[in-house]
Swiss-Prot record:
The active site is at residue 112. This is Lactamase-like protein notP. Binds 2 Zn(2+) ions per subunit. One of its GO terms (molecular function) is hydrolase activity. Lactamase-like protein; part of the gene cluster that mediates the biosynthesis of notoamide, a fungal indole alkaloid that belongs to a family of natural products containing a characteristic bicyclo[2.2.2]diazaoctane core. The first step of notoamide biosynthesis involves coupling of L-proline and L-tryptophan by the bimodular NRPS notE, to produce cyclo-L-tryptophan-L-proline called brevianamide F. The lineage of its organism: Eukaryota, Fungi, Dikarya, Ascomycota, Pezizomycotina. CDD domains: LACTB2-like_MBL-fold. Keywords: Hydrolase, Metal-binding, Zinc. GO terms for biological process: secondary metabolite biosynthetic process. Its EC number is 3.1.-.-. Zn(2+) 2 binds at residues 112-113. It comes from Aspergillus sp. (strain MF297-2). Zn(2+) 1 binds at residues 108, 110.
Amino acid sequence: MAPGEGGYRQINKALNICAFEDYLEGQQKALPSLPDVEQISPRVLRVLGQNPASHCKFTLQGTNTFVVGTGPERLIVDTGQGIPEWADLIHETLARRGITLSHVLLTHWHGDHTGGVPDLIRMYPHLSSAIYKHEPSKTQQPITDGQIFRVEGATVRAVHTPGHSSDHMCFVLEEEHGMFTGDNILGHGTSAVEHLSTWMHTLYKMQAQDCTTGYPAHGIVISNLRTKIKGELAQKLQRERQVLKALVQAKQAERARMERAKGSVTVKELVATMYGNGVGAGIRELALEPFMDEVLRKLAEDGAVAFEVRGRVKKWFAPDA
Protein backbone atom coordinates (compact mmCIF):
# COMPACT_ATOMS: atom_id res chain seq x y z
CA MET A 1 0.00 0.00 0.00
CA ALA A 2 1.35 3.42 -0.92
CA PRO A 3 2.30 5.86 1.87
CA GLY A 4 -0.79 7.24 3.50
CA GLU A 5 -3.19 5.30 1.29
CA GLY A 6 -6.28 4.00 3.00
CA GLY A 7 -8.70 6.85 3.62
CA TYR A 8 -11.15 7.54 0.86
CA ARG A 9 -11.11 4.07 -0.66
CA GLN A 10 -12.55 2.63 2.54
CA ILE A 11 -14.84 5.49 3.50
CA ASN A 12 -17.93 5.94 2.20
CA LYS A 13 -21.41 5.02 1.62
CA ALA A 14 -22.45 8.63 1.60
CA LEU A 15 -20.35 9.84 -1.29
CA ASN A 16 -17.52 8.07 -3.08
CA ILE A 17 -15.90 11.29 -4.13
CA CYS A 18 -13.37 9.56 -6.38
CA ALA A 19 -16.16 9.15 -8.93
CA PHE A 20 -16.00 12.91 -9.44
CA GLU A 21 -12.38 12.68 -10.69
CA ASP A 22 -12.92 14.84 -13.75
CA TYR A 23 -15.02 17.40 -11.89
CA LEU A 24 -12.54 17.66 -9.05
CA GLU A 25 -9.64 18.04 -11.48
CA GLY A 26 -11.40 21.04 -13.01
CA GLN A 27 -12.29 22.39 -9.57
CA GLN A 28 -8.69 22.03 -8.41
CA LYS A 29 -7.51 24.33 -11.19
CA ALA A 30 -9.54 27.12 -9.60
CA LEU A 31 -8.20 26.58 -6.08
CA PRO A 32 -6.03 29.38 -4.70
CA SER A 33 -2.42 28.38 -4.31
CA LEU A 34 -1.13 28.20 -0.75
CA PRO A 35 2.47 28.61 0.42
CA ASP A 36 4.18 25.49 1.71
CA VAL A 37 4.63 27.15 5.11
CA GLU A 38 2.56 30.04 6.44
CA GLN A 39 1.96 31.64 9.83
CA ILE A 40 -1.83 31.92 9.54
CA SER A 41 -2.42 33.28 13.04
CA PRO A 42 -0.26 34.27 16.02
CA ARG A 43 -0.61 30.71 17.36
CA VAL A 44 -0.99 28.59 14.23
CA LEU A 45 1.64 27.70 11.63
CA ARG A 46 0.37 25.75 8.60
CA VAL A 47 2.57 23.32 6.67
CA LEU A 48 1.19 21.74 3.48
CA GLY A 49 1.36 17.97 3.13
CA GLN A 50 2.90 18.03 -0.37
CA ASN A 51 0.07 15.74 -1.57
CA PRO A 52 -2.16 17.86 -3.82
CA ALA A 53 -2.46 15.21 -6.53
CA SER A 54 -3.35 12.17 -4.42
CA HIS A 55 -5.06 9.12 -5.84
CA CYS A 56 -8.56 10.57 -5.57
CA LYS A 57 -7.80 14.30 -5.77
CA PHE A 58 -9.74 15.08 -2.61
CA THR A 59 -6.87 16.59 -0.66
CA LEU A 60 -7.34 19.93 -2.45
CA GLN A 61 -4.04 21.83 -2.09
CA GLY A 62 -2.76 19.08 0.20
CA THR A 63 -3.38 17.96 3.77
CA ASN A 64 -2.80 20.79 6.23
CA THR A 65 -0.50 20.13 9.16
CA PHE A 66 -0.81 22.69 11.95
CA VAL A 67 1.97 23.55 14.39
CA VAL A 68 0.26 25.16 17.39
CA GLY A 69 1.61 27.38 20.16
CA THR A 70 3.88 30.38 20.67
CA GLY A 71 6.80 28.98 22.65
CA PRO A 72 9.73 26.72 21.80
CA GLU A 73 7.66 23.58 22.53
CA ARG A 74 4.48 23.17 20.48
CA LEU A 75 1.97 20.55 19.43
CA ILE A 76 1.08 19.41 15.94
CA VAL A 77 -2.30 18.52 14.40
CA ASP A 78 -2.25 15.86 11.64
CA THR A 79 0.78 14.51 9.83
CA GLY A 80 0.03 14.44 6.13
CA GLN A 81 0.18 11.40 3.89
CA GLY A 82 3.72 10.19 4.41
CA ILE A 83 5.24 12.16 1.55
CA PRO A 84 9.05 12.48 1.98
CA GLU A 85 8.99 16.15 0.94
CA TRP A 86 6.57 16.85 3.80
CA ALA A 87 8.93 15.27 6.33
CA ASP A 88 11.81 17.35 4.99
CA LEU A 89 9.69 20.49 5.13
CA ILE A 90 8.62 19.83 8.73
CA HIS A 91 12.20 19.16 9.82
CA GLU A 92 13.54 22.30 8.14
CA THR A 93 10.69 24.48 9.43
CA LEU A 94 11.00 23.37 13.04
CA ALA A 95 14.80 23.58 13.04
CA ARG A 96 14.84 27.04 11.50
CA ARG A 97 12.38 28.34 14.08
CA GLY A 98 13.86 26.51 17.07
CA ILE A 99 10.66 24.53 17.72
CA THR A 100 10.30 21.13 19.37
CA LEU A 101 7.11 19.05 19.52
CA SER A 102 5.38 17.73 22.63
CA HIS A 103 2.17 16.15 21.26
CA VAL A 104 0.91 14.86 17.92
CA LEU A 105 -2.89 15.08 17.64
CA LEU A 106 -4.61 13.14 14.86
CA THR A 107 -8.08 14.17 13.73
CA HIS A 108 -8.90 10.67 12.41
CA TRP A 109 -7.47 7.48 10.98
CA HIS A 110 -7.38 8.23 7.24
CA GLY A 111 -3.99 7.81 5.63
CA ASP A 112 -3.67 11.37 4.37
CA HIS A 113 -3.71 12.49 8.04
CA THR A 114 -1.72 9.72 9.73
CA GLY A 115 0.78 8.78 7.01
CA GLY A 116 3.53 11.04 8.35
CA VAL A 117 3.57 9.53 11.85
CA PRO A 118 6.46 7.12 11.10
CA ASP A 119 8.54 9.99 9.72
CA LEU A 120 7.90 12.10 12.82
CA ILE A 121 8.94 9.26 15.11
CA ARG A 122 12.03 8.61 12.97
CA MET A 123 13.06 12.27 13.19
CA TYR A 124 11.92 12.81 16.80
CA PRO A 125 11.97 9.47 18.69
CA HIS A 126 10.52 11.02 21.87
CA LEU A 127 7.20 11.39 20.02
CA SER A 128 6.69 7.62 19.92
CA SER A 129 4.73 7.89 23.19
CA ALA A 130 3.04 11.19 22.29
CA ILE A 131 0.81 10.23 19.32
CA TYR A 132 -2.82 10.87 20.28
CA LYS A 133 -5.93 9.63 18.48
CA HIS A 134 -9.50 8.71 19.34
CA GLU A 135 -9.82 4.92 19.06
CA PRO A 136 -6.00 4.62 19.15
CA SER A 137 -3.82 1.76 17.99
CA LYS A 138 -1.73 -0.12 20.54
CA THR A 139 1.16 2.32 20.13
CA GLN A 140 -0.98 5.47 20.38
CA GLN A 141 -2.50 7.40 23.26
CA PRO A 142 -6.27 7.95 23.53
CA ILE A 143 -8.09 11.22 23.01
CA THR A 144 -11.37 11.67 24.86
CA ASP A 145 -14.09 14.24 24.37
CA GLY A 146 -13.19 17.36 26.35
CA GLN A 147 -9.54 16.41 26.88
CA ILE A 148 -7.23 19.42 27.17
CA PHE A 149 -3.75 19.77 25.66
CA ARG A 150 -1.61 22.75 26.67
CA VAL A 151 1.52 24.33 25.29
CA GLU A 152 2.79 27.88 25.71
CA GLY A 153 0.24 30.26 24.19
CA ALA A 154 -2.33 27.61 23.30
CA THR A 155 -5.03 25.63 25.07
CA VAL A 156 -6.48 22.96 22.79
CA ARG A 157 -9.69 21.12 23.70
CA ALA A 158 -10.71 17.91 21.95
CA VAL A 159 -14.28 17.48 20.69
CA HIS A 160 -15.50 14.10 19.43
CA THR A 161 -17.12 14.81 16.07
CA PRO A 162 -18.01 11.58 14.22
CA GLY A 163 -19.50 11.70 10.75
CA HIS A 164 -16.67 11.89 8.26
CA SER A 165 -15.33 8.91 10.22
CA SER A 166 -16.39 7.33 13.51
CA ASP A 167 -13.17 8.33 15.28
CA HIS A 168 -13.13 11.92 14.03
CA MET A 169 -12.03 14.62 16.46
CA CYS A 170 -12.02 18.39 16.13
CA PHE A 171 -9.89 20.60 18.35
CA VAL A 172 -10.90 23.97 19.78
CA LEU A 173 -8.13 26.56 20.16
CA GLU A 174 -9.56 28.38 23.15
CA GLU A 175 -7.43 31.54 22.93
CA GLU A 176 -8.63 32.28 19.39
CA HIS A 177 -12.16 30.84 19.47
CA GLY A 178 -10.85 28.78 16.57
CA MET A 179 -11.42 25.16 15.63
CA PHE A 180 -9.32 22.63 13.78
CA THR A 181 -12.19 21.10 11.82
CA GLY A 182 -10.40 18.11 10.32
CA ASP A 183 -12.32 16.70 7.37
CA ASN A 184 -15.79 17.46 8.72
CA ILE A 185 -15.65 20.98 7.28
CA LEU A 186 -13.27 21.82 4.43
CA GLY A 187 -11.89 25.11 3.22
CA HIS A 188 -13.44 24.52 -0.21
CA GLY A 189 -16.59 22.58 -1.07
CA THR A 190 -18.11 19.90 1.12
CA SER A 191 -16.74 16.74 2.68
CA ALA A 192 -17.42 13.06 2.10
CA VAL A 193 -18.99 11.36 5.10
CA GLU A 194 -19.47 7.84 6.42
CA HIS A 195 -22.87 8.43 7.99
CA LEU A 196 -24.96 11.42 7.00
CA SER A 197 -27.23 11.53 10.04
CA THR A 198 -24.29 11.34 12.45
CA TRP A 199 -22.41 14.00 10.51
CA MET A 200 -25.35 16.41 10.62
CA HIS A 201 -25.73 15.93 14.37
CA THR A 202 -22.00 16.58 14.66
CA LEU A 203 -22.33 19.86 12.74
CA TYR A 204 -24.79 21.07 15.36
CA LYS A 205 -22.28 20.06 18.06
CA MET A 206 -19.53 21.95 16.24
CA GLN A 207 -21.86 24.93 15.89
CA ALA A 208 -22.45 24.89 19.65
CA GLN A 209 -18.73 25.45 20.30
CA ASP A 210 -19.32 28.99 18.95
CA CYS A 211 -15.95 29.22 17.21
CA THR A 212 -15.38 32.04 14.75
CA THR A 213 -12.43 30.70 12.73
CA GLY A 214 -11.98 27.29 11.16
CA TYR A 215 -8.66 25.63 10.42
CA PRO A 216 -9.64 22.80 8.05
CA ALA A 217 -7.49 19.81 7.20
CA HIS A 218 -7.77 20.75 3.52
CA GLY A 219 -8.02 24.19 1.98
CA ILE A 220 -7.95 27.77 3.14
CA VAL A 221 -8.67 29.18 6.59
CA ILE A 222 -12.42 29.57 7.14
CA SER A 223 -12.88 33.16 8.29
CA ASN A 224 -16.51 32.71 9.39
CA LEU A 225 -16.96 29.17 10.64
CA ARG A 226 -20.48 29.80 11.93
CA THR A 227 -21.65 30.80 8.44
CA LYS A 228 -19.85 27.86 6.83
CA ILE A 229 -21.48 25.31 9.14
CA LYS A 230 -24.87 26.93 8.70
CA GLY A 231 -24.47 26.70 4.93
CA GLU A 232 -23.49 23.02 5.07
CA LEU A 233 -26.57 22.20 7.13
CA ALA A 234 -28.84 24.23 4.85
CA GLN A 235 -27.48 22.47 1.76
CA LYS A 236 -28.11 18.99 3.15
CA LEU A 237 -31.57 19.90 4.45
CA GLN A 238 -32.45 21.29 1.03
CA ARG A 239 -31.39 18.00 -0.57
CA GLU A 240 -33.63 16.13 1.87
CA ARG A 241 -36.56 18.32 0.87
CA GLN A 242 -35.84 17.65 -2.80
CA VAL A 243 -35.83 13.89 -2.20
CA LEU A 244 -39.09 14.05 -0.26
CA LYS A 245 -40.67 16.14 -3.01
CA ALA A 246 -39.61 13.62 -5.65
CA LEU A 247 -41.11 10.75 -3.63
CA VAL A 248 -44.38 12.63 -3.13
CA GLN A 249 -44.56 13.36 -6.85
CA ALA A 250 -43.95 9.68 -7.64
CA LYS A 251 -46.78 8.71 -5.30
CA GLN A 252 -49.14 11.28 -6.80
CA ALA A 253 -48.35 10.14 -10.34
CA GLU A 254 -49.01 6.49 -9.54
CA ARG A 255 -52.15 7.27 -7.58
CA ALA A 256 -53.56 9.00 -10.62
CA ARG A 257 -53.70 5.48 -12.07
CA MET A 258 -54.18 3.40 -8.91
CA GLU A 259 -55.91 4.80 -5.82
CA ARG A 260 -53.92 3.07 -3.06
CA ALA A 261 -50.54 3.07 -4.78
CA LYS A 262 -47.47 4.03 -2.77
CA GLY A 263 -45.43 5.26 -5.69
CA SER A 264 -42.40 3.38 -4.40
CA VAL A 265 -39.19 3.72 -6.41
CA THR A 266 -35.70 2.30 -6.33
CA VAL A 267 -32.65 4.41 -5.60
CA LYS A 268 -31.67 4.09 -9.25
CA GLU A 269 -35.07 5.37 -10.38
CA LEU A 270 -34.97 8.25 -7.92
CA VAL A 271 -31.53 9.34 -9.11
CA ALA A 272 -32.73 9.24 -12.72
CA THR A 273 -35.74 11.38 -11.80
CA MET A 274 -33.72 13.98 -9.92
CA TYR A 275 -30.58 14.17 -12.07
CA GLY A 276 -31.81 13.13 -15.51
CA ASN A 277 -29.91 11.07 -18.05
CA GLY A 278 -27.09 13.55 -18.64
CA VAL A 279 -24.99 12.20 -15.77
CA GLY A 280 -22.52 9.46 -16.66
CA ALA A 281 -23.11 5.91 -15.48
CA GLY A 282 -19.94 5.92 -13.38
CA ILE A 283 -20.95 8.98 -11.39
CA ARG A 284 -24.49 7.65 -10.97
CA GLU A 285 -23.38 4.25 -9.71
CA LEU A 286 -20.34 5.21 -7.66
CA ALA A 287 -21.46 8.54 -6.23
CA LEU A 288 -25.05 9.67 -6.70
CA GLU A 289 -26.75 6.37 -5.93
CA PRO A 290 -24.74 5.69 -2.73
CA PHE A 291 -25.31 9.30 -1.68
CA MET A 292 -29.05 9.00 -2.38
CA ASP A 293 -29.19 5.79 -0.38
CA GLU A 294 -27.58 7.58 2.57
CA VAL A 295 -30.07 10.47 2.35
CA LEU A 296 -32.96 7.99 2.27
CA ARG A 297 -31.60 6.07 5.26
CA LYS A 298 -31.36 9.30 7.24
CA LEU A 299 -34.91 10.25 6.26
CA ALA A 300 -36.05 6.77 7.31
CA GLU A 301 -34.36 7.22 10.69
CA ASP A 302 -36.29 10.49 10.98
CA GLY A 303 -39.55 8.72 10.11
CA ALA A 304 -40.04 10.80 6.96
CA VAL A 305 -39.79 7.96 4.42
CA ALA A 306 -40.31 4.21 4.38
CA PHE A 307 -39.42 1.30 2.13
CA GLU A 308 -40.77 -2.02 0.98
CA VAL A 309 -39.04 -5.00 -0.59
CA ARG A 310 -40.50 -6.33 -3.81
CA GLY A 311 -38.80 -9.28 -5.41
CA ARG A 312 -35.68 -8.67 -3.29
CA VAL A 313 -35.54 -5.06 -4.49
CA LYS A 314 -35.80 -2.24 -1.95
CA LYS A 315 -38.19 0.50 -3.02
CA TRP A 316 -38.68 3.78 -1.18
CA PHE A 317 -41.83 5.83 -0.73
CA ALA A 318 -43.30 8.76 1.16
CA PRO A 319 -45.81 7.37 3.67
CA ASP A 320 -49.19 9.01 4.09
CA ALA A 321 -49.30 11.52 6.91
